[in-house]
């Protein structure tokens, strides 16, 4: 019909940036069984590849419509090539059976592993401690006056010719959520430096040592 637009794709879909175009790739079937509101992107297992968490379910439907609440919060581990494997509740340890909404990540206990917080509609917010991931490098950013958290700062680990995924410090992430400003990056064998791009321009290379667990960076002060 003229003037109307119709949706034809309803899967939760990942869009891979192929340089000048995006490639749509539907997430695995287990992540399609319930609507997702919040999404968290982090390296939960510490293998250097980004993983996903989906906060799922929508139960307040009208009397004639079934509830969409078959999810329990879905964790998907990535292989760095755009493929993801779903983990069940017993393997991930995460079970959010209510109506998940916001999801955010942070290393709340400073052990070098990314933890997860999930908000629910009409129920308590849950905190999931990551006790099995490989500890990474904790990066504290001081963006200076007007931007103390360094919002907009991008960074990645350098290991020889290899480069890790780019992370950006953001003021918002997903459904009414904000990840912790401190970033955790996987430290593969041979990691020698942290590449940084500052939000007001300019790039910086910060040396890191094998086994180093934390670094503080600033665009106007020596790194430590």
Go through the PLM ranges and name each one.
Residues 35-40, 52:
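Extended, hydrophobic alpha-helical segments in both membrane/secreted and soluble proteins
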Residues 4-12, 16-35, 55-224:
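Gly/Ser/Thr/Pro-enriched helix-cap/hinge segments flanking short amphipathic alpha-helices
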Residues 47, 51, 111:
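Acidic carboxylate motifs that coordinate Ca2+ or other divalent cations, activating on Asp/Glu
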